Amino acid sequence: MSAPRRELAGGTRGAVYVEFLIAFLPLFSFFLCLVQLAMLQTANLIVKHAAVVAARAAVVILPDDPDRYGGANINRAEGARREKIVQAATIPLSTLEDIPFPEVRFPTDEGGDDDRVVFGRDDLVRVQVNQLYRCRVPLARTIVCGAFFGLKRLRGEASLPNQGAGYGYE
C-alpha cells in the first residue's frame, strides 16, 4: 500500500460528519413525531368541541317550532332537524378539513354505537361526532397515526338535558 492510501485508511477526517448524521436522524424524527402528535391532539380538541356545539344545537333544535323544519315532528332527530345539528357540528370541523364530513350520532349510552331518533322532554341528549383526521407530517404520520393512509378516527361526545318547551306550537 502506498503512503497516501495508508494515510487515508487511518485518517479521522469526516468522523464528526458521520456522528452528526447518526445523531441527527433520530432527533429529527422525534421532532417530527412531536409536531404530528401536537397537531393530532389539537384536532382531537376540535372534534370534542364540535360534539359540544352539536349537543347545544340539538337541545335547541329538537323541541323547536315544527314550521321552521318543514313540519317535522318535535323531539325527533331526523330530516331537516338532523341536518341542522350536523351543520352545527361541521362548522368547528372546518378548521381541520376544507370540506369535513362528520358522522353525527345520538347514542343512548356513553360510547355507544346506536343512533337514537326520538327524545322526550328532560331526556339526556347525547351527541357523538366522529371525524377522520388526515395526518400530514412526513415520516411522523406513519408512526403516530398508523400505516393506514395516515388517517386517524377522532371521536367527541357531549350530552345535555332536553329542556324543551312545555307548551305546544300553533
Regions found by a protein language model. Name each.
Residues 2-3, 57-170:
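Short, conserved structural patches
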Residues 2-90:
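Alpha-helical assembly-interface signal, strongest on the long, hydrophobic N-terminal helix that forms
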